[in-house]
């Protein structure tokens, strides 16, 4: 209690609505109960817990030895959309009296259910602090809207995954009030060991059932497409009947459409079928043993994509209800579960497999983190929550200073040798540029980027430039959605799995975009260069390596794993020289600056490089420019090497033309002017006649990487899209 400055126990109200949220809240409740010196626990039970058709699951809370302070009957029967709305309204009518009586310091609310929305709304309007469990996640249904609405009402957030944490930050929630703890249920899942699991299996599925030889099915209605979800449930039952394995079917939740799903079960005689056991509720301790030892789980419950991964049990996820969730390799998605055969094939593929344990959603230590977080809450702090919005003008009316400001971006280019930061105007003018040697270690590099950006932002104020955001161009494979460098090039050391967005955004309080340098060059051409107004074009960068970017229908193509446009690694020869990627015969192995330097050194070592009018100082390394100079001065061998390099690049372009059929190819970088004529010749000789009319040009942009990085920021401000 000394930690938060409170001079009394923290009164915590945990409100639970159904069997699913109790499985997440129970570990926290047990943790609170073990620390009576710090906490007082009040338990409020409402929703489907109190309905007989759904198993009267409030009894399991009593069996766990929790005193239920209040039972609220809040469900309006009908199982349709109107009934859900009326249930929220009924809860809003009843909750104020309860909260006035309990007077909690903080209410813990879980997830994305309509009951939880009523709880959060009531607490927020009554100035009660709210701790929201599992915010920031994405499922792909109406639940997302409810979950994010609760996030906006909540004062504190406990999330389960790094992505969820980033989503909360993107939603402008206060970083200091977000805890990445993992899922509380994983504390139980990862320690769940029951030697007598066979007795649990026999109790629910019969004496003749073996471990890993049965299925658990749990499917809920999709409230935005009830008709389709009922049809999908019917197909699922038909497939399970045909698959002919013992199956435990749990009744659906109370959402709109659940009544129709139960009718489907009864129409098909599932409750009396010898291969099926239909149940309204299974206690969580027993349920985890059942899924842990099942041959497969099928349905669309979040339990399948979240909790079951802890055991490596195969899961078949049907439809779109969990389409946005992060999943382990144990999950097979059947998004268009529109035929019985498709579902049956999925059962044949998954049943009986065993996958590694997945810890995407937790490591088993969530509850201690949450209790520590609760203890840190200072009740003396103002209740009003703060949002971390990017800086914007407070006054929307125009004044002369606003009109005279230059809308600009901070652009960062992480090259193999140098680190550059520039202030770039909306017109593509580089107002000021800073250059430093790129450090070799991760810590030094991040520190230098932050230092240079802070200095540039301060200078921008003096130059009357309004910085709208930060764009970063870097070598390697980049996930632009998360702002993370996944894998770097060999030229940039210690640069794998690096989150660039968060430290810069936290320091500068500006939005940050990150992308691969080849993609940035293509975006620069689209906004400022010869690609402006072009629907389809390809940019090839010729420098130390070979990179590129593809614009298709005005949009940049990233590919399914952010690996599109690795054009330098198109193979143009089966027995060509080794490439830095580990393959051989790539364009980069012939036409990059590194490749030309390699050939220049060979010639120099054999005294075949220098011709009359040339010299290389002893302290100067032989490089590509010496090879080019020798070729210009008539060195036949140097000319042959350049011709081979240009031919390799040309063959790569031909492959691109035959694949993408762009109307324009832009060669960029220091070597572009030396290759342009050779590339055009190769196209005339090797390409199909239908693509030979393509325009192949040399870029006229001086700093495409910086301009492309800036364009990510400047495009966002004008188009208002990410």
UniProtKB/Swiss-Prot annotation:
Annotated tissue distribution: Widely expressed. Highest expression is observed in liver.
Residues where UDP binds: 19, 23, 113, 220, 253, 282, 301-302, 307, 321
Segments of this protein annotated with the region N-acetylmannosamine kinase: 406-722
Active site: 517
Main location group: cytoplasm
Known outcome of mutating residue 49 to A: Loss UDP-N-acetylglucosamine 2-epimerase activity. No effect on N-acylmannosamine kinase activity. Does not interfere with enzyme oligomerization
Residues given in the record as CMP-N-acetyl-beta-neuraminate binding sites: 259, 271, 280-281
Known EC number: 3.2.1.183, 2.7.1.60
Residues holding an N-acyl-D-mannosamine 6-phosphate: 416, 476-477, 489, 516-517, 545, 569, 588
GO molecular function term, any single one: ATP binding
Catalytic reactions of this protein: UDP-N-acetyl-alpha-D-glucosamine + H2O = aldehydo-N-acetyl-D-mannosamine + UDP + H(+); an N-acyl-D-mannosamine + ATP = an N-acyl-D-mannosamine 6-phosphate + ADP + H(+)
Consequence recorded when altering residue 155 to A: Loss UDP-N-acetylglucosamine 2-epimerase activity. No effect on N-acylmannosamine kinase activity. Strong reduction of the dimerization process
Residues engaged in binding Mg(2+): 413
UniProt pathway annotation: Amino-sugar metabolism; N-acetylneuraminate biosynthesis
InterPro entries: ATPase_NBD, ROK, UDP-GlcNAc_Epase, UDP_GlcNAc_Epimerase_2_dom
Alphabetical UniProt keywords: Allosteric enzyme, ATP-binding, Cytoplasm, Hydrolase, Kinase, Magnesium, Metal-binding, Multifunctional enzyme, Nucleotide-binding, Phosphoprotein, Transferase, Zinc
Gene Ontology terms: cellular component: cytosol
UniProt-annotated location(s): Cytoplasm, Cytosol
PTM comment text: Phosphorylated. Phosphorylation by PKC activates the UDP-N-acetylglucosamine 2-epimerase activity.
One GO biological process term: glycosylation
General function of this protein: Bifunctional enzyme that possesses both UDP-N-acetylglucosamine 2-epimerase and N-acetylmannosamine kinase activities, and serves as the initiator of the biosynthetic pathway leading to the production of N-acetylneuraminic acid (NeuAc), a critical precursor in the synthesis of sialic acids. By catalyzing this pivotal and rate-limiting step in sialic acid biosynthesis, this enzyme assumes a pivotal role in governing the regulation of cell surface sialylation.
Family indicated by similarity: In the N-terminal section; belongs to the UDP-N-acetylglucosamine 2-epimerase family.
NCBIfam families (alphabetical): NeuC_NnaA
Protein name per Swiss-Prot or TrEMBL: Bifunctional UDP-N-acetylglucosamine 2-epimerase/N-acetylmannosamine kinase
Annotated organism of origin: Rattus norvegicus (Rat)
């Amino acid at each position: 209690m000394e930690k938060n400055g409170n001079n009394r126990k923290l009164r915590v109200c945990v409100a639970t609505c159904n069997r699913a949220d109790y499985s997440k809240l129970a570990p926290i409740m047990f943790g609170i109960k073990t620390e009576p010196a710090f906490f007082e626990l009040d338990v409020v039970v409402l929703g489907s817990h109190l309905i007989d058709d759904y198993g009267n699951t409030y009894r399991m809370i009593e069996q766990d030895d929790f005193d239920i302070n209040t039972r609220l009957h809040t469900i309006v029967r009908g199982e349709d959309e109107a009934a859900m709305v009326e249930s929220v309204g009924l809860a809003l009518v009843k909750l104020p009296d309860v909260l006035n009586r309990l007077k909690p310091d903080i209410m813990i609310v879980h997830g994305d259910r309509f009951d939880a929305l009523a709880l959060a709304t009531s607490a927020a309007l009554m100035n009660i602090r709210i701790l929201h469990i599992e915010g920031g996640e994405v499922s792909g249904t109406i639940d997302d809207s409810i979950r994010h609405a609760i996030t906006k009402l909540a004062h504190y957030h406990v999330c389960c995954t790094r992505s969820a944490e980033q989503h909360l930050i993107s939603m402008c929630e206060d970083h200091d009030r977000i805890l990445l703890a993992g899922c509380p249920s994983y504390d139980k899942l990862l320690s769940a060991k029951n030697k007598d699991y066979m007795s649990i299996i026999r109790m629910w599925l019969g004496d003749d059932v073996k471990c890993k030889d049965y299925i658990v099915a749990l499917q809920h209605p999709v409230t935005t497409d009830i008709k389709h979800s009922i049809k999908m449930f019917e197909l699922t039952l038909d497939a399970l009947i045909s698959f002919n394995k013992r199956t435990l079917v749990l009744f659906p939740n109370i959402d709109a459409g659940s009544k129709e799903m139960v009718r489907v079960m009864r129409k098909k005689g599932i409750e009396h079928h010898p291969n099926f056991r239909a149940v309204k509720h299974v206690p969580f301790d027993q349920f985890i043993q059942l899924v842990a030892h099942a041959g497969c789980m099928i349905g669309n419950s979040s339990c399948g994509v979240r909790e079951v991964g802890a055991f490596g049990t195969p899961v078949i996820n049907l439809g779109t209800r969990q389409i946005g969730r992060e999943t382990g390799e144990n999950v097979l998605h059947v998004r268009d579960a529109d035929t019985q055969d498709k579902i049956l094939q999925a059962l044949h593929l998954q049943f009986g497999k065993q996958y590694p344990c997945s810890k995407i959603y937790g490591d088993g230590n969530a509850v201690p983190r949450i209790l520590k977080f609760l203890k840190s809450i200072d009740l003396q702090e103002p209740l009003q929550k703060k949002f971390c919005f990017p800086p914007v003008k407070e006054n929307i009316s125009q004044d002369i200073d606003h009109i005279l400001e230059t809308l600009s971006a901070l652009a960062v280019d992480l090259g193999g040798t140098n680190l550059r930061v520039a202030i770039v105007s909306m017109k593509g003018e580089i107002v000021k540029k800073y250059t430093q040697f790129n450090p070799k270690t991760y810590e030094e590099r991040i520190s230098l980027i932050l230092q240079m950006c802070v200095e540039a932002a301060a200078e921008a104020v003096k130059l009357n430039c309004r910085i709208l955001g930060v764009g970063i161009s870097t070598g390697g494979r980049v996930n632009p959605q998360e702002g993370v460098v996944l894998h770097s090039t060999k030229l940039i050391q210690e640069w794998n799995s690096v989150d660039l967005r968060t430290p810069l955004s936290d320091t500068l309080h500006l939005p940050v975009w990150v992308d691969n340098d080849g993609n940035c060059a293509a975006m620069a051409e689209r906004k400022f260069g010869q690609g402006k107004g072009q629907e389809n074009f390809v940019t090839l960068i010729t420098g130390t390596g070979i990179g590129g970017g593809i614009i298709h229908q005005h949009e940049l193509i990233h590919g399914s794993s952010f690996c599109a446009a690795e054009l330098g690694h198109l193979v143009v020869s089966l027995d060509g020289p080794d490439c830095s990627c580990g393959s051989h015969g790539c364009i980069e192995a012939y036409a990059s600056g590194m490749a030309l330097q390699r050939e220049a050194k060979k010639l120099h070592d054999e005294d075949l490089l220098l011709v009359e009018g040339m010299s290389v100082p002893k302290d100067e390394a032989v490089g590509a420019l010496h090879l080019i100079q020798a070729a210009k001065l008539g060195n036949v061998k140097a000319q042959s090497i350049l011709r081979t390099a240009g031919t390799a690049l040309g063959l790569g372009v031909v492959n691109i033309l035959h694949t993408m059929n762009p109307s324009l190819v832009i060669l960029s970088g220091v070597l572009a002017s030396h290759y342009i004529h050779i590339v055009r010749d190769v196209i005339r000789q090797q390409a199909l006649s239908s693509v030979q009319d393509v325009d192949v040009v040399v870029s006229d942009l001086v700093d495409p990487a910086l301009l492309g990085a800036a364009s990510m920021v400047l495009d966002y401000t004008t188009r208002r899209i990410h």
